[in-house]
Amino acid sequence: MAFMGQSKMDTLARMAKDINPEINLRLFPQGVMPENVDEFLNDVDVYVDGLDFFALPARRMVFAKCREKGIPALTAAPLGMGTAFLYFSPAGMSFEDYFKVEGYEQQEQYARFIAGLSPAMLNRDYLVAPEAVNFIEKRGPSTIMACDLCAGVMGTSVLKLLLGRGSLKAAPWGMHFDAYHQKLKSTWRPFGNSNPLQWLLLKFIRPVLQRGPPRG
């Protein structure tokens, strides 16, 4: 409860300094925008995606800039009680080529982002409070178990990249681990969301995203 009501940025900065008091942090309280994205990525070796799910325009901008600068970009999404992981190599498939959200309205972009994040959808059958998720109101709470799994998978992947210790499969390869079902699934979606399997998945996802708040 010590951090209740405080900004996420200030809270995470304090946590990082508690772990390493000598850490050098550059904070961007105004957010990442076209005007400061180059400064944001200055001297970056690996980009770890920590943007909110609904910040898709900013995410697309940062991933595009990472590719332009030759920076590896990784994302790990907390889904249900698991994590879905993707790695975008500067020499491999791009974020845009994989997710293919250009030219679509907002809800369809969200649908395509979800489908691309987790082609396996291992978490689809155990959500007990579906009303907690509302894409119209931009609500999608995460469990702490999923967030901790994201941190573990991401930390290990960054270590492998920075130290050159073993290979890391890049998009269109993906990985989803679900602790609830105790399942690990590797996915391969050539052509990204243009893959026929993704078309079928999108047919399942679109109606879910159209749900509004429950009627009294």
Regions from the language model: what does each represent?
Residues 161-216:
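Phosphate-binding loop/pocket of nucleotide- and phosphate-handling active sites
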Residues 46-89:
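ADP-ribose/adenylate-binding Rossmann-like module
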Residues 1-20:
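Glycine-rich phosphate-binding loop and adjoining beta1-alpha1-beta2 segment
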Residues 90-92, 152-166:
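Oxidoreductase and adenylate-handling cofactor-binding alpha/beta cores
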Residues 40-42:
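A short, aliphatic-rich alpha-helical micro-motif
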Residues 95-149:
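A conserved mid-domain beta-alpha-beta active-site/ligand-binding segment of alpha/beta enzyme cores
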Residues 29-31:
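Conserved acidic residues
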Residues 35-37:
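Short acidic active-site motifs
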